[in-house]
Amino acid sequence: QMRLQLKRKLQRNRTSFTQEQIEALEKEFERTHYPDVFARERLAAKIDLPEARIQVWFSNRRAKWRREEKLRNQRRQASNTPSHIPISSSFSTSVYQPIPQPTTPGSMLGRTDTALTNTYSALPPMPSFTMANNLPMQPPVPSQTSSYSCMLPTSPSVNGRSYDTYTPPHMQTHMNSQPMGTSGTTSTGLISPGVSVPVQVPGSEPDMSQYWPRLQ
């Protein structure tokens, strides 16, 4: 309790200022930061305050002004710092390497064209595919001719039905110049995909009765 009482005695009562007093003090502070004793006494009589309180207010106001001025200087330096940072030559050389410029305007294009030409020349030439090379037109041999003709009976009439021998258009000239086949010539007739039966094509009157049971 004694301690609290002593502390209260040492503490000074805070002075409360009215709006008119603060305005008069601020106006005097704008005129001078260090008013003399005569100015303080005249102001004290004007705003009804002790001269000691006015002196303390000016002291606190100057301290506040110095803090604000310090902050303003720091902000001003921070805003001006990026434009005034010196860049050393070693830093700029190590980070930003100079870009080599071509000696002549067309040198870069010339090098590019040469590289493209070398690339395309290194590719193997594409083989030319023509119908004449891949599909040679050879005259049909008698065995091929007979294989086409054996797909249907060569007899004019079998079991009362007549059949005509199928001849491809491009083989008609060879069919007219070459005989259908000689006696004893044997070829393979294609009945269905993957099935083949030997068929004898005689040159004279054929006997088809022995072949029809196989086909049926």
From Swiss-Prot:
Residues 68-109 are annotated as: Disordered. GO terms for cellular component: nucleus. Residues 81-94 have a biased composition (Low complexity). GO terms for molecular function: DNA binding; DNA-binding transcription factor activity, RNA polymerase II-specific. SMART domains: HOX. CDD domains: homeodomain (cd00086). It is found in: Nucleus. InterPro entries: HD, Homeobox_CS, Homeodomain-like_sf, PAX_fam. Gene3D superfamilies: Homeodomain-like (1.10.10.60). The keyword Transcription applies. Residues 10-69 bind DNA. It holds the Pfam family Homeodomain. Keywords: Developmental protein, DNA-binding, Homeobox, Nucleus, Transcription, Transcription regulation. Belongs to the paired homeobox family. May be a transcription factor with important functions in eye and nasal development. Interacts with MAF. This is Paired box protein Pax-6.
